[in-house]
């Protein structure tokens, strides 16, 4: 969730298609000197910079105080990182310039009787603040300062490519959450797992699940598409591991579009999570080094120690720029609040070593033309796995870790690999239109951990296995943003994507070697899902029209055609032969929205949008009896979701708030019914589904050094699995309980900041009472603490996760307490300490 001092319009907004782009700097613009001189109307404050470029600013006032935050700036002064002067001019009591945050310089101006006014301009020396006051002196009356014209001194305008074009956040007719670099770094002190960071900060998204996948983390009760710089990460039927495809250190900002959208294509029934990688620097050279350690505080067990290293290097040589980030993270083992080792499952993050490389190369051919190539590689390895999970008795209420050392042979160790290649070209004015073209390729490989048990859901297999999935995706986008005159524009274009999906096998393992020696040895393969091609072609157009100062309309459509092709017959695990074939589908989807400004501080929006996704073909092909591509058309039809949403946004001097309500419905939902008893087979139910909910956000700067805020997120949902008009609750895997977060921050000293943050997850037993869930979900609360202090030339950060050492099971883990997978009911970590130090040079 965004902080008030970093946002302009409001912290949550959007439209029915979205990616977010905003000019941002990997490090700050350096302020190397400060000059202050008295003028006829007050003072002129010169902040000397090497670039002379005016940064984005945010203003607020209280009492007789004016605060101006300069975003993406850093003080680099020989006299230290604070400048202050008392009574510099009549009517001005004090002036103070401080490094408020790692990327924010704050100018604080205090008047004697009135709030000073200030205009920010650029000069050859740097940034000039012309400060004046309405106070009059006896010798010479000061001229009355002119108030800024409407729009002249607006706060920062975060832009959202809601229609794949840049827009002011307050102009978007839907809910969007923007997570900036500072917030990402803040949460990364507690976890390097992106899914848990999103769970802490995004309304409508499931709470942190402490796993390497987003199971139990839907967005408004449905699956979200995840993009990296516009490259889609989710292929048809893929395991939800996409948040492991990039490290937080490689991210500049994240835009989350809440609710179905189709402008970026399919797989976005719940919305879009667009991850924007680190942006080029404006300095000739910048670098940041970070190291950190962590451990469980219960007993500082040796196995619990974690470590991380990060390095960022950026160059900018006129028309050429280069950005490189490297990060390494070793999680160690986890221990719960009772001092027990957390039971390791296939999805837990213990003993995980992660590497991430991001390289970005850009060339500006002219002021209007730019070519950029991005390479991102991520690798997860789980090593030294000397414990396995085992179901415990009901009294303990959790799975337990059982010692059992495993050694892997011949490429059988669990891992996740992902590679992204992305080429972008931009022409800002080609025949009157802004043109953007993109080509991308992605390769993903995943091998699961070997469980010390037999798979019970697939009786025909009858042996111990682990699974492998390997798929590739390539595609491209071409779009043009054309002005229509009269404050209106149209974005139009074409997308194409080809997925080499499926290709999943179970590795048959040597049972005797596993049981007697703990050796994981592959002795054969069992095909689970055949390789199939899934191609998509989309045409779209989106119109924006500002009717007047109060009313703005938007609307558009997308026509999508896709083809499923299974080239060879396939024998699935239940003994059925799936006949080869090809099937073509098409969908046309619409969106319509309006924004109305009730006043300068308050606006409202309403929208209708549609999203769609093909069902996970693997869930159909791998377990369905007597299935044929051409004959079972209804089972593989795309799921189309309609959503209606209304909302209010408010932006005052020191408060940002939002409130939205939504209802979405799909006539042909795709709900995987998981068996509750061993030996049963999962099935995919294609039936009507509905989801509804309310979301609220608040950020309040109480006074100069204190800030509070939080989010409230509640949703519910039902499915008519038998299509008889009798709806039953959706499972907790799809509908997460009430989520409430809150934070309190204090700037204790100019170089010292402290934060407490609370996560409360409510109970949910509605699905359990109607025999949908195998366990009720009990509520829990987690309190975290973070302290950041300037130390030497760098910054020291100390974080304590689960400060009160609360013993609990995450919601997704509680849902496994009963049923056929009780060994997956792992507890959360107890109190855990992290310490890291970063240095920019």
Q: Where do the protein language model's features map onto the residues?
A:
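Signal-peptide-cleaved, periplasmic/extracellular N-terminal interaction regions immediately downstream
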Residues: 22-151
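Gram-negative outer-membrane beta-barrel transporters
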Residues: 290, 548-549, 562, 661-666, ...
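Transmembrane beta-barrel wall of Gram-negative outer-membrane proteins
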Residues: 300-331, 336-385, 417-429, 484-485, ...
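C-terminal beta-signal and adjacent terminal beta-strands/loops
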Residues: 612, 760-767, 788-841
């Amino acid at each position: 969730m965004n902080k008030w001092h970093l946002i302009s319009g409001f912290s949550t907004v959007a439209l029915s298609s979205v990616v977010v782009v905003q000019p941002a700097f990997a490090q700050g613009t350096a302020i190397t000197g400060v000059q202050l001189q008295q003028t006829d109307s007050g003072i002129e404050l010169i902040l000397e910079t090497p670039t002379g470029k005016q940064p984005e600013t945010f203003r607020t006032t209280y009492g007789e105080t004016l605060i101006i935050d300069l975003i993406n700036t850093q003080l680099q002064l020989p006299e230290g990182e604070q400048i202050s002067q008392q009574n510099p001019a009549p009517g001005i009591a004090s002036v103070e310039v401080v490094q408020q945050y790692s990327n924010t310089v704050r100018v604080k101006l205090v008047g004697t009787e009135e709030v000073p006014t200030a205009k920010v301009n650029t000069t050859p020396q740097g940034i000039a603040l012309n400060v004046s006051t309405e106070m009059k002196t006896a010798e010479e009356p000061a001229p009355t300062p002119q108030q800024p014209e409407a729009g002249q001194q607006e706060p920062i305008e975060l832009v959202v490519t809601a229609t794949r074009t840049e827009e002011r956040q307050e102009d978007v007719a839907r809910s969007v959450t923007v997570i900036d670099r500072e917030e990402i770094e803040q949460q990364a002190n507690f976890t390097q797992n992106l899914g848990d960071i999103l769970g802490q900060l995004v309304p409508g998204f499931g709470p942190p699940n402490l796993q390497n996948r987003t199971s139990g983390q839907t967005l408004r009760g449905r699956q979200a598409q995840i993009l990296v710089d516009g490259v889609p990460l989710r292929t048809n039927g893929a395991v939800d591991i996409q948040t492991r495809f990039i490290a937080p250190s490689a991210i500049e900002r994240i835009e989350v579009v809440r609710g179905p959208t189709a402008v970026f294509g399919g797989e976005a029934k719940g919305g879009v999570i667009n991850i924007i990688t680190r942006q080029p620097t404006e300095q000739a050279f910048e670098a940041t080094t970070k190291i950190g350690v962590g451990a469980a505080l219960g007993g500082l067990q040796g196995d619990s120690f974690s470590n991380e290293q990060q390095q960022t290097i950026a160059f900018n040589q006129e028309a050429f720029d280069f950005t490189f980030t490297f990060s390494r993270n070793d999680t160690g083992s986890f221990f719960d609040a009772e001092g027990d080792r957390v039971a390791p499952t296939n999805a837990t993050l213990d003993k995980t070593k992660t590497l991430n490389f991001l390289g970005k190369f850009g060339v500006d051919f002219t002021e209007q033309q730019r070519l950029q190539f991005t390479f991102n590689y991520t690798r997860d390895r789980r090593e030294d796995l000397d414990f396995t999970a085992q179901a415990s008795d009901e009294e303990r209420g959790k799975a337990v870790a059982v010692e059992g050392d495993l050694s892997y042979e011949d490429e059988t160790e669990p891992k996740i690999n992902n590679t992204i290649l992305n080429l972008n070209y931009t022409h800002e004015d080609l025949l009157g239109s802004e043109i953007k073209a993109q080509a991308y390729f992605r390769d993903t490989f995943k091998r699961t951990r070997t469980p010390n048990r037999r798979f019970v859901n697939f009786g025909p297999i009858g042996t111990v296995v682990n699974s492998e999935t390997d798929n590739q995706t390539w595609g491209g986008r071409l779009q043009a943003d054309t002005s229509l005159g009269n404050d209106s524009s149209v974005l139009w274009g074409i997308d194409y994507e080809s997925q080499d999906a499926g290709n999943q096998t179970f590795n048959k393992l040597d049972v005797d070697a596993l049981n007697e020696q703990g050796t994981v040895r592959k002795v054969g393969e069992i095909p689970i899902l055949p390789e199939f091609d899934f191609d998509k072609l989309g045409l779209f157009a989106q119109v924006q029209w500002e009717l007047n100062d109060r009313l703005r309309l938007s609307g558009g459509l997308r026509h999508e055609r896709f083809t499923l092709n299974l080239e060879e017959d396939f024998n699935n695990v239940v003994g059925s032969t799936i006949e080869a074939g090809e099937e073509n589908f098409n969908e046309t989807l619409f969106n319509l929205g309006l924004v109305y400004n009730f006043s300068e501080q308050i606006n409202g929006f309403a929208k209708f949008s549609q999203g769609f996704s093909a069902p996970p073909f693997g869930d159909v092909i791998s377990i369905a009896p007597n299935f044929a591509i051409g004959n079972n058309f209804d089972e593989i039809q795309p799921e189309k979701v309609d959503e209606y949403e209304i909302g209010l946004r408010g932006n005052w001097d020191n408060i940002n708030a939002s409130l939205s309500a939504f209802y979405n419905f799909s006539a042909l939902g795709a709900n995987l019914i998981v068996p509750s008893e061993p030996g049963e087979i999962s099935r995919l139910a294609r039936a009507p589904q509905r989801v509804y909910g309310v979301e609220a956000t608040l950020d309040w700067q109480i006074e100069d050094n204190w800030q509070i805020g939080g989010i409230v997120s509640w949703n519910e949902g039902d499915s008519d699995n038998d299509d008889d008009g009798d709806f039953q609750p959706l499972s907790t895997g799809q509908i997460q309980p009430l989520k409430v977060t809150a934070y309190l921050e204090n700037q204790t000293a100019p170089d010292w900041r402290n934060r407490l943050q609370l996560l409360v997850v409510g109970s949910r037993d509605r699905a359990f009472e109607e025999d949908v869930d195998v366990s009720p979900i009990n509520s829990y609360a987690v309190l975290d603490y973070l302290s950041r202090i300037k130390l030497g030339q760098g910054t020291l950060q100390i974080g304590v996760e689960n400060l009160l050492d609360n013993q609990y099971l995450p919601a997704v883990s509680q849902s496994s307490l009963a049923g056929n997978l009780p060994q997956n009911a792992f507890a959360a970590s107890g109190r855990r300490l992290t310490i890291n130090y970063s240095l920019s040079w």
